[in-house]
C-alpha cells in the first residue's frame, strides 16, 4: 500500500474529473494511472519527484498490477512516499549509466516514462535522446508542463521567462513527433500546466530521428494585401 508524506493520495483520486486547476492536474495523473493499470507488470520511469504527487499515483498503479516504479531526482526525495514497488535513485536523470547500473531491469524495456524534472529545452531534448530507445513498442512518453499559455501576459501565472521556456518545450515535443511521425501517436491534455503523451509504435530497438524544426509561415502576399485593405 502506498503511503504519501506531503499530501493525501485519496484526494487526487477524488479530484479527477472535477473543475479547477487541481482537478485538471489530478485528471492528468489519473490518465497515466489508467494506462499503467491496463498493463501486466509494467516498468515505469519517473524523471522528477519533488513532493511525490505523481510518484504516489504512479506507484499506486504499479502496485495494482505487479509493476515497478523507478523515480529519479537530484534532490533526496527518498522519503516522500513508501511503496514496495518503488525504487528511488538520487541522480541527474540524464546520467543513464548510473541509472541502468542501479536499476538494470529498465534495460528490459520501459512501459511509461514521465518527464517532469528540469524544465529546459536542452535537458528535455537530452532525456528524449537517452530514454526513447528504452521505451517498449506501444509504451508511452508523458511530458508534464508543456503549455505556455498560463504564463502568458495577463494570465494567472504571468511570467515571461517561464512562458518562453514552456513554449520551447511545447515546440520540441511537436518537432520530435513530426520527425518520427510514422512511429508515434501524440495527444495533449490541457489545463493546469498541460501534459503531452506520445505512444511509441516502433520496435524498442529502433532509434529516433533527430528533431527538426519546421519553419512556420506568418505572412503571405495574400494575407498582407487583406491587411492593407483593412480585412483580417
Task: Report the location of each language-model feature.
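A short alpha-helical cap/connector motif
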Residues: 1-114, 118-232
Amino acid at each position: 500500500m502506498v503511503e504519501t508524506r506531503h499530501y493525501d493520495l485519496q484526494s487526487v483520486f477524488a479530484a479527477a474529473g472535477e473543475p479547477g486547476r487541481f482537478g485538471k492536474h489530478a485528471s492528468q495523473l489519473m490518465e497515466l494511472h489508467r494506462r499503467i493499470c491496463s498493463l501486466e507488470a509494467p516498468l515505469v520511469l519517473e524523471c522528477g519527484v519533488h513532493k511525490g504527487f505523481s510518484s504516489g499515483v504512479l506507484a499506486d498503479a504499479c502496485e495494482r498490477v505487479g509493476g515497478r516504479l523507478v523515480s529519479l531526482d537530484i534532490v533526496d526525495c527518498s522519503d516522500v512516499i513508501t511503496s514496495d514497488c518503488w525504487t528511488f535513485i538520487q541522480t541527474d536523470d540524464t546520467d543513464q549509466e548510473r541509472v541502468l547500473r542501479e536499476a538494470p531491469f529498465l534495460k528490459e524495456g520501459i512501459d511509461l516514462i514521465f518527464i517532469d524534472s528540469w524544465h529546459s529545452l536542452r535537458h528535455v531534448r537530452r532525456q528524449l535522446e537517452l530514454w526513447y530507445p528504452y521505451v517498449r513498442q506501444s509504451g508511452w512518453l508523458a511530458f508534464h508542463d508543456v503549455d505556455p499559455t498560463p504564463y502568458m501576459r495577463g494570465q494567472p501565472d504571468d511570467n515571461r521567462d517561464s512562458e518562453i521556456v514552456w513554449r520551447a518545450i511545447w515546440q520540441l515535443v511537436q518537432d520530435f513527433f513530426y520527425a518520427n511521425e510514422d512511429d508515434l501517436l501524440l495527444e495533449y491534455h490541457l489545463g493546469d500546466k498541460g501534459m503531452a503523451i506520445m505512444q511509441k509504435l516502433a520496435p524498442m530497438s529502433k532509434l529516433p530521428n533527430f528533431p527538426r524544426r519546421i519553419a512556420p509561415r506568418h505572412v503571405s502576399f495574400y494575407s498582407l494585401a487583406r491587411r492593407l485593405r483593412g480585412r483580417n
